[in-house]
């Protein structure tokens, strides 16, 4: 939905709200836990800077810039300093082929996509001494370098491999649960335990 204007006309938008919109709104109004849902910011940035992609064209994931915009929402919920998305110094730093191109065996015929970095990111902000544990899907991989630059101690566990003992013994100061829409059923199962 971030780049919906690029979809073929034969694929109309059926619903303006999806499951994630509904769940985020529900959790924001029925819990005291900070719920970060950055769709509007990502969509706005995609429209303002169409040449600087936030998601890969041949991959189901956001790139490192989209991930940083998403992670900044978490930092803001923690009352931590961030920059506006346009203020980060972004540089191209290589190329990659996307997971969908690889699965479809089109990696040789589709052009490689640029990857980006924010040079000097670790020096932009003071290091935080708290420990951060991320339980998330593959999208969280893309923001871990930024998280590791901001915190003294941080680690990530995939939603398919962590154990529910985290409910009673989180082992961290900050627990981030990160899920994309495909994994909402897993998020619901985890939330039932809290």
Residues covered by each model-derived region:
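Extracellular glycan-modifying ectodomains
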Residues: 1-194
């Amino acid at each position: 939905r971030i780049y919906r204007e690029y979809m073929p006309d034969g694929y109309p938008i059926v619903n303006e709200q999806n499951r994630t919109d509904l769940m985020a709104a529900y959790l924001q109004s029925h819990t005291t836990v900070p719920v970060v849902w950055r769709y509007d910011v990502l969509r706005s940035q995609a429209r303002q800077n169409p040449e600087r992609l936030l998601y890969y064209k041949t991959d189901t994931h956001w790139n490192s810039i989209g991930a940083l915009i998403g992670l900044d929402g978490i930092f803001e919920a923690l009352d931590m300093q961030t920059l506006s998305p346009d203020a980060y110094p972004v540089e191209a730093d290589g190329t990659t082929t996307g997971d969908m191109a690889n699965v479809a065996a089109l990696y040789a015929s589709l052009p490689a996509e640029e990857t980006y970095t924010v040079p000097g990111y670790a020096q932009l902000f003071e290091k935080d001494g708290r420990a951060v544990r991320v339980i998330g899907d593959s999208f969280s991989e893309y923001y871990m370098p930024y998280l590791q630059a901001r915190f003294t101690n941080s680690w990530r566990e995939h939603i398919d491999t962590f154990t529910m003992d985290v409910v009673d013994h989180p082992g961290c100061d900050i627990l981030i649960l990160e899920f994309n829409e495909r994994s909402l059923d897993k998020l619901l199962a985890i939330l039932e335990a809290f």
